[in-house]
């Protein structure tokens, strides 16, 4: 029988298992990973072993009670299957292309990143990347100015980072891609269902 702990056999697979089953931005999860690693954190979530002294016992108990019912090997298996089906890359801290700036988030840093496309953009220096974001219901003037800004930055060799929403985000991507520039789209809803669907062609 496949169990969630048997799937979490190394740091990478354990981080995938944690990310597939737990909420993001969980400080206790981050604290445990920093203290004992992802494999042991998964065992602790499943109810095996004693918590490290670095983690408050009350917080640890509440955390286990919250996450234990969510642990489902099928969820992890499905996440891994979708990763393969969509040709996604899995990045964890320590990988060559992991964006080290995320480490500044400490215990709230992402457990893992799923990436589609060119992963090397993520490890570019911060000064090479510029984030552009704004209203979804943007005016034509707002989209025009966004396009000019993104185009100028692209010609200056910058990588444009934006969400995938309508309006300003989409305008930034289009303007940067038109001359053959590079963009990063941050997809909050996941890479298995590109949203909004009206921007699917742009995002793909």
Label each residue range with its predicted role.
Residues 1-11, 23, 92-204:
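Glycine-biased, small-residue-rich flexible motifs in mid-sequence functional cores and linkers
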Residues 1-97:
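Short, small/acidic-rich helices and loops at N termini and domain boundaries
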């Amino acid at each position: 029988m496949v169990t969630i702990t048997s799937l979490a056999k190394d740091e990478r697979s354990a981080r995938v298992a944690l990310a597939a089953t737990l909420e993001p931005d969980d400080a206790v999860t981050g604290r445990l990973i920093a203290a004992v690693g992802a494999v042991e954190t998964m065992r602790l979530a499943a109810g095996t072993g004693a918590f490290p002294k670095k983690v408050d016992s009350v917080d640890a108990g509440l955390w286990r009670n919250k996450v234990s019912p969510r642990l489902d090997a099928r969820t992890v298996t499905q996440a891994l299957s979708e990763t393969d089906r969509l040709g996604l890359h899995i990045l964890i801290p320590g990988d060559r292309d992991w964006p080290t700036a995320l480490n500044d988030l400490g215990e709230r840093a992402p457990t893992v990143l799923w990436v589609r496309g060119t992963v090397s953009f993520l490890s570019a220096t911060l000064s090479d990347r510029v984030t552009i974001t704004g209203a979804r219901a943007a005016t034509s003037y707002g989209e025009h100015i966004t396009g000019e800004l993104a185009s100028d930055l692209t010609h200056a060799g910058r990588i444009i980072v934006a969400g995938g929403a309508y309006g300003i985000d989409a305008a930034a991507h289009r303007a940067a891609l038109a001359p053959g520039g590079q963009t990063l789209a941050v997809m909050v809803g996941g890479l298995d269902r590109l949203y909004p669907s009206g921007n699917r062609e742009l995002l793909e």
